[in-house]
A protein has these predicted regions:
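Conserved N-terminal/central alpha/beta ligand/cofactor-binding core
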Residues: 33-122
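Beta1/beta-strand and adjacent pyrophosphate-binding region of the FAD-binding site
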Residues: 1-13, 29
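Aromatic pocket-lining residues of Rossmann-like dinucleotide-binding sites
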Residues: 21
Length: 122
């Protein structure tokens, strides 16, 4: 007998939870109160931007729509290290150290983006 999971909302967290439940074999139902054009939670206001750490451009190739595009080889993607991400988060913490959850956010950020990409989340 499969488990039934109900997801309320259709933002990033909700859809990620739904995908994870599907991967575990659950039957998933998503309820969204908003009209389709207004759905997507706070993510709809980010223009798809999500912060994640990476050491170099090679780690980004699997995320690109067309990594063989000739412009890619001439692009310097730089890096956004975990240390830089942590420093940026500290700017929002009013002098408090990073929480356990923030540390997980940083350490799992690339892995999470890759996981979302593997499920065609755009």
């Amino acid at each position: 007998m499969s488990k039934k999971v109900v997801i309320v909302g259709s933002g990033n967290a909700a859809l990620s939870a739904g995908i994870a439940a599907l991967e575990k074999g659950a039957e998933v139902t998503i309820y969204e109160k908003a009209e389709k054009k207004m759905s997507g939670g706070n993510t709809k206001y980010t223009a798809g931007a999500m912060r994640f750490s990476y050491e170099n451009g090679d780690q980004l190739m699997g995320l690109l729509k067309n990594p063989k595009d000739k412009r890619v080889k001439n692009t310097d993607f730089g890096s956004y290290t975990q240390e830089k991400f942590e420093k940026d988060l500290l700017n929002f913490n009013d002098g408090r150290p990073l929480s356990h959850e923030q540390k997980i956010l940083v350490s799992k950020s690339l892995e999470t983006i890759q996981w979302l990409s593997s499920h065609n989340v755009k």
